[in-house]
Amino acid sequence: MNDREEGKGMRLLRKGKRGLIQAIFSRLGLIVLLFLLQLALLLGLFSAAAEFLPHFFGGTIVFNAIIVIYLLNSEGDPTAKLTWLVFFSVAPVFGALFYLYTKSDIGHRLLRERTTQLIREGRSDLRAHASAQQHLEERDPQIARMASYIAKSGCYPVWEHTAVTYFPLGEDKFAALLPALRQAKHFIFLEYFIVEEGEMWGQVLSILVEKVKQGVEVRVLVDGTCEFTHLTHDYPRRMQELGIKCKMFAPVRPFVSTHYNYRDHRKIAVIDGQVAFTGGVNLADEYINRVVRFGHWKDTAVMLRGEAVRSFTLMFLNMWAIDEHTMESSRFLAYPTKPVMDAPGFVLPYSDSPVDGNKVGEQVYIDILSRARRYVHIMTPYLIIDHNMETALQYAAERGVDVHLILPGIPDKKYAFSLAHTHYASLMKAGVKISEYTPGFVHAKVFVADDREAVVGTINLDYRSLYHHFECAAYMLDVPCIADIEADFQHTLKQCRRMTPERLKNDKLSMKVAGALLKAIAPLM
């Protein structure tokens, strides 16, 4: 079904809400049922083991002790380890067995091996094209070391000759994306966490169909959870019938596995290797305020033109090739990227993988906080952080740096809002300023520091983004649009309510209790 609505573009799905009966007997209902049956089986096996092991009391103690020693000596976040220890103390045998199950997941190992291989191949693809690292070392050796770390952790070097445009709202990004898509001559790559039919996606899809008819290669990669939340399991087939290559990343199957914990949270658009977009804006109407869900939706994005676009081209191709035997990077990187020779500064696109052991997203944020001299201004939808990030925020403020966070005034997830408030008191005590955006929901992921550094991307200050998602961002140094980012922060701040210890005390008791309980298991959520 290909419907067109006036001014809203194409639709591939029928409008209408599904009733309870349809939901129960849908593919999602079947998968949920199979999940529950498998969980019931696992719980039964664990319960049987729990009943059997007490007959060998000494064996139970030794078994738990071995698991605890292994946990304490393994790599990982100390807060997460503490959470597991609490779990062990509440349910000793079940907790230990469940921990072993999550650690032995085969899907995780296969994903890690494949991403490592792709990074190795990608490093050779971009090495010959980047010469900015030496210039950065001459400009700022400390930041050059961070760039070297990012290049070593992944395969994305620092670039010069790249113009960056900052969009303070999703509507602004959308207005720039449409003409960029219409100008495509060779290829269009779209990678998004959420795609939902409506005005935004409808207009984009209409352009993609026209471009396919003109011989442009179009690829769309969507996170697999969209099959249940916004699209249908056969949506890739519907797209392919239109000539658009479409994939779901890690589609959810009816098998219990921690493999599904790793989601593709990135938002990338690349056109002909000349233009790239990233930021918090997905392809759904709430991101451009055509649909109001949590008040005004405040989001941000950037558009790159110039050499750094090559990194986003490779970033997309790496993710596309995860379930394939070969990667076609050389064919698309062969298209010459036009450098913007008069564009000052440095741009460093980077990605963060949950399976390689390098927490690049968190390290870049901490690096900015540790280097700042005057201010670090942050916009984030969530604040569910580990000890390292909390300490970095506190230490920067205690050094006299103006550390100021803007969070939502109207949350999209009440549990996340409760968890965020559990961090407020300790941060404010150290001098960190926190404000909440009263008109609605902040979905922006922005760091800006000292009028010369900034990050705009997809990386939230929460465990999901920092530990469990595939993410991406653009780091900028001495780029003119950094002034626009700081100006937007100040403009947004005027619409915020400053949080104080007194206001925090007025939180509802239910919110305080929920936050305290959830904080104990936050790393496992």
Describe every region a protein language model picked out.
Residues 193, 381-382, 416:
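Glycine- and other small-residue-rich loops at beta-strand/loop junctions that grip anionic moieties
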Residues 386-390, 404-406, 414-418, 436-437, ...:
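Extended hydrophobic-aromatic, low-complexity segments
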Residues 399, 404-449:
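A beta-strand-loop signature enriched in Asp, Gly, Thr, and Trp
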Residues 372, 382-404, 408, 413:
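Helical hairpin unit composed of two closely spaced alpha helices linked by a short loop
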Residues 2-363, 367, 371, 395, ...:
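N-terminal localization/anchoring segments of enzymes in phospholipid and broader phosphate metabolism
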Residues 299, 379-380:
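A short, conserved beta-strand element enriched in hydrophobic/aromatic residues
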